[in-house]
């Protein structure tokens, strides 16, 4: 096994981050960058692309799980 340490860029500030167990916030360089990223997800500035869910297509369609 190689002793080479892989480094990745922090997704927020692009600072180089070693990919080791000691890198507590990896892939982020710091708690600050980790929280900035979390805030972007919470504010819906980021999203995982997907097809629209079937239940979201027609709000008038009811099923057994709908609140009545």
UniProtKB/Swiss-Prot annotation:
GO terms for molecular function: DNA topoisomerase type II (double strand cut, ATP-hydrolyzing) inhibitor activity; zinc ion binding. Belongs to the DNA gyrase inhibitor YacG family. Inhibits all the catalytic activities of DNA gyrase by preventing its interaction with DNA. Acts by binding directly to the C-terminal domain of GyrB, which probably disrupts DNA binding by the gyrase. InterPro entries: DNA_gyrase_inhibitor_YacG (IPR005584), Znf_NHR/GATA (IPR013088). PANTHER family: DNA GYRASE INHIBITOR YACG (PTHR36150:SF1). Zn(2+) binds at residues 10, 13, 29, 33. The gene is yacG. It comes from Haemophilus influenzae (strain PittEE). It comes from the Bacteria. This is DNA gyrase inhibitor YacG.
């Amino acid at each position: 096994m190689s002793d080479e340490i892989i480094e990745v860029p922090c997704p927020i500030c692009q600072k180089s981050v070693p990919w080791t167990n000691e890198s507590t916030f990896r892939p982020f360089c710091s708690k600050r960058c980790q929280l900035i990223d979390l805030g972007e997800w919470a504010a819906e500035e980021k999203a995982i692309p997907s097809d629209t869910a079937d239940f979201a297509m027609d709000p008038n369609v009811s099923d057994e799980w709908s609140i009545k």
